[in-house]
Amino acid sequence: MHYNAEQKSKIILKFGFNNIKNTGITEVQVALLTQRINALKSHFNKHKQDHHSRRGLLHIVTRRRKLLKYLKKSSVLRYNNLIESLALRH
């Protein structure tokens, strides 16, 4: 369910414009939240009655949605590139 530091640093490098310290960029934050959401999806396939963790998942999804809304408002091009690379919307 959890991801290690190596996976996290790969995401930061990919979406942080090749800078490992660039963790505050909206794209990096959304990508990290997306990875956490995907990890929780597999958890819920096993543990369908885990309502406490489901509430945490909803909190993470809300944070990602707010960040995506901010990114779309500030830069539509960066928003579209991120959506395409993470395959979030169809």
From Swiss-Prot:
Recorded GO CC terms: cytosolic small ribosomal subunit
Keyword Ribosomal protein: yes
Secretion signal span: none
PROSITE patterns in UniProt: RIBOSOMAL_S15 (PS00362)
Keyword hit for RNA-binding: yes
Gene Ontology annotations of biological process type: translation
GO molecular function: rRNA binding; structural constituent of ribosome
Coiled-coil annotated spans: none
Highest taxon above the source species: Bacteria
Keywords associated with the record: Ribonucleoprotein, Ribosomal protein, RNA-binding, rRNA-binding
Pfam families cross-referenced by the UniProt entry: Ribosomal_S15
Role noted for this protein: One of the primary rRNA binding proteins, it binds directly to 16S rRNA where it helps nucleate assembly of the platform of the 30S subunit by binding and bridging several RNA helices of the 16S rRNA. Forms an intersubunit bridge (bridge B4) with the 23S rRNA of the 50S subunit in the ribosome.
Subunit text: Part of the 30S ribosomal subunit. Forms a bridge to the 50S subunit in the 70S ribosome, contacting the 23S rRNA.
Family to which the UniProt record says this protein belongs: Belongs to the universal ribosomal protein uS15 family.
Name recorded for this polypeptide: Small ribosomal subunit protein uS15
Gene name for this UniProt entry: rpsO
